[in-house]
């Protein structure tokens, strides 16, 4: 049975990747269908109730700069906001928000339901329709076929998902949801490498049974940050505290005593877990010399008693979970509302993807999110936006687009995945980016919004606000460069008390701002130098561009050198055995990875600069040198 309409783009799955993919394709004018097994869980925060953090917050800002929904929803759902690394340089500062699960889900669903060109339909997908290596549609659980030349799969942990609590296990996509078994079996028939990964979640605790007086209170920042470039503090709901406690030796003894019934340590779980978000069992095993581990006590919302104890993700049996929770200070009488568990699921080797996130094997089939081996809402949302956008571009007959590594963390993420692959759940850190001084949270819109507008992702309201901000920054920079003060002027007499070394020569306002002891707000408060910019985002941009101009210029020069051959394209049909001079190891690796560009090839382990030179000579001789989009 065929559905009565055709669609330009079909998105399968309604998590963080799926919602951003569907919204992106629809914003670009494509007739889009979002298929989900349950409309009520669209935008669900399946694990921790938080958005952002180091590296992750950068991705959220990039999603926002390209017109995505995650940052906006966070501003409406965030019940605590903090700027991490606030005492460090701007490159590594990151915004993190504790979110009310219900408010976040409601806001995402509201955005989806009001998006033109987007249809939502509740049905699980069991099959793909593929003809001559081209996807042409999907088939749902009830046998209903939907036709489309572009399909984005955002299946999360649902592909052959198996939930483990102790030595007991059962099939599930996440707690309370069925797995996608038929679709997983269908995907295993495709010529794409498949593996198993695992992730986990902690038990949820009843707040009424916690003694918060024994814990350290952690308040949010003041003044309050916002997540979206279009956000405002007035969008935030009521702000509340989180709390901090610690495990202890008794906790660790309880965990060690239960390891014989741990699915991880008894060989029941085959999948590899996230290195940077390990289970409490893993922490005790890997860091045996540590006598305690920090636990963040995070409220799940304003109208629920559920608490998320961040730091004790576990798949131990329930009796062990209860004992370990009650061994922790402040939780001696705690009651568990939901047990912690681990979940194993299928993922597909992202080296089998183009950097558009389209599969190399099947035209029109795109993957985004945990299906590609990543972990985290932010990583999923960023991939979803890129996949939905490129699916729409393909339907429109336009070239795919992906930012370079020096343009966005999204570019770093996709390049790492498609070039290097991953054997464990991949999460983003600022340390993964070579050019992080240019890839700051604060300038994500300056880096990406113009491109987003060109692609059709950015609406008129965002574009107008961005254009106004850019103009105000440029005018203020011109003012600071163009206004000068003499050492004997009244302005200097007012300024000198604020300086470590008095001004002894004529100086521009820009030079004064560049001094280490001076910042923009302080300078603007001194009579004769203000009033300055009212928009805090624009003011921050002015300060960073002035103070870091030398470093930024040097990093830009490094990038210009590096990208000379970065985008030189490599034919996917090229058999590297035909390239004379390459070693057998290099031939095997290049034929295995099938990199799209010289830049990707150069980042494959074992590919030497000499091999790259040989490749370039071969391409030139054969007339195959071309620049990738």
UniProtKB/Swiss-Prot annotation:
NCBIfam families: mnmG_gidA (TIGR00136)
Listed name of the protein: tRNA uridine 5-carboxymethylaminomethyl modification enzyme MnmG
Cofactor: FAD
Gene name linked to the record: mnmG
Organism listed in the record: Shewanella baltica (strain OS223)
Residues annotated to bind FAD: 13-18
This protein's UniProt keywords: Cytoplasm, FAD, Flavoprotein, NAD, tRNA processing
Subunit structure, interactors included: Homodimer. Heterotetramer of two MnmE and two MnmG subunits.
GO biological process, one term: tRNA methylation
Subcellular location: Cytoplasm
GO MF annotations in UniProt: flavin adenine dinucleotide binding
Record has NAD as a keyword: yes
Family classification: Belongs to the MnmG family.
Function as written in the Swiss-Prot or TrEMBL entry: NAD-binding protein involved in the addition of a carboxymethylaminomethyl (cmnm) group at the wobble position (U34) of certain tRNAs, forming tRNA-cmnm(5)s(2)U34.
GO-annotated cellular components: cytosol
Chain residues that bind NAD(+): 273-287
